[in-house]
Design a protein with these regions (language model features):
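Terminal, low-structured helical/coil segments at or just beyond the last alpha-helical repeat
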Residues: 144-147, 151-179
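Conserved alpha-helical positions within TPR/SEL1-like repeat arrays
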Residues: 5-18, 25, 32, 41-56, ...
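TPR/TPR-like (Sel1-like) alpha-helical repeat modules
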Residues: 107, 128, 132-158
């Protein structure tokens, strides 16, 4: 196993333990090693990981900068899946910053890319995030429609998502009956 990969795995373990500063250090070191080895995709993954850590730490600007850079690299290299994931991460960061319009734009970009590559699960999850943002923005009907459409796309819904599906189906039936 390469030194970069070892550092990456150590970073993931530390992240899962909630040791964010230590995880960020390992990811930064892995980033340097991957860059030296000319492994741009892996280096960009480390940037994306750093962005996720900075979001957890509420260091919004650093989070956005890291994920933006990762997104640019993924786009340049033609990795649409990772680019879409980075767009989705940016949506979450912008939403946390209270920049709802930028969050919605980022999620829409992610949804488009996920649709392009046929990843319905991630497309659905992202549509649900967009739906929540639209709902909070006062665009209730549009938000509910996006959330419901996203919920239907998720192949392996959580228990809560399954319950929500049932409730939305009941609501639609009652509405169609005039209740």
């Amino acid at each position: 196993m390469s030194k970069a990969k070892e550092l990456q795995e150590a970073g993931l373990r530390l992240f899962q333990e909630g040791l964010y500063d230590e995880a960020a250090q390992r990811f930064s070191e892995a980033l340097e090693h991957y860059a030296e080895e000319g492994k741009e995709i892996e280096a960009a993954e480390m940037l994306n990981n750093l962005g996720i850590i900075r979001r957890k730490q509420e260091r919004w600007e650093e989070a956005a900068e890291a994920v933006e850079e990762a997104k640019r690299i993924f786009a340049r290299l033609g990795d649409k899946s990772r680019e879409a994931q980075a767009w989705g991460n940016l949506g979450g960061i912008y939403a946390s910053m209270g920049k709802r319009d930028k969050a919605m734009e980022a999620w829409q970009a992610a949804i488009g890319l996920f649709a392009e590559i046929g990843d319905e699960d991630k497309q659905g999850e992202t549509m649900m995030s967009l739906g929540i943002a639209l709902f909070k923005d006062g665009r209730r009907q549009e938000g509910l429609a996006a959330y419901q459409a996203g919920l239907q796309m998720v192949k392996h819904p959580t228990t809560m998502q399954q319950v929500t599906r049932v409730l939305m189906t009941i609501q639609a039936k009652l509405f169609s009956l005039g209740f």
